[in-house]
Amino acid sequence: MELVKVVFMGWFKNESMFTKEITMMKDDVQWATTQYAEVNKALVKAFIDDKKVCEVDCRG
């Protein structure tokens, strides 16, 4: 199990933005990205070492 520092960047329908930086298990990044997107009804992108590793859009 590998710990990584992940930066989540999210955009709401009204174009406002949020960021969150956490250290977590690499295997959980996709799940966490989906949760942030669903809960916030936002487009969320996850970055590890400045590389986008996943993206989920729940702005509907």
From Swiss-Prot:
Q: Which UniProt keywords apply?
A: Evasion of bacteria-mediated translation shutoff by virus, Host-virus interaction, Toxin-antitoxin system
Q: Which domain of life is it from?
A: Viruses
What InterPro entries would the database entry show?
Answer: Dmd (IPR035137)
The UniProt record lists the keyword Ligase: no
What Pfam families does the entry give? Dmd
Q: Which residues form the signal peptide?
A: none
The entry summarizes the disruption phenotype as follows: Phage grows very poorly in wild-type E.coli K12 or in cells expressing plasmid-derived toxin-antitoxin system LsoA-LsoB; if the host has a deletion in rnlA-rnlB no effect is seen. Absence of full-length transcripts of late (18 to 28 minutes) T4 genes, and thus loss of synthesis of late proteins. Partially suppressed by overexpression of host IscR.
Q: Indicate whether NAD appears among the record's keywords.
A: no
What is the role of this chain?
Antitoxin component of a potential type II toxin-antitoxin (TA) system. Acts as an antitoxin against host toxins RnlA and LsoA, preventing them from degrading T4 bacteriophage-derived mRNA and thus permitting successful virus infection. Stabilizes middle (8-10 minutes) and late (18 to 28 minutes) T4 gene transcripts.
Please give the subunit comment from the record: Can form a complex with non-cognate host toxins LsoA and RnlA.
Q: What is this protein called?
A: Antitoxin Dmd
Query: Which source organism does the UniProt entry give?
Result: Enterobacteria phage T4
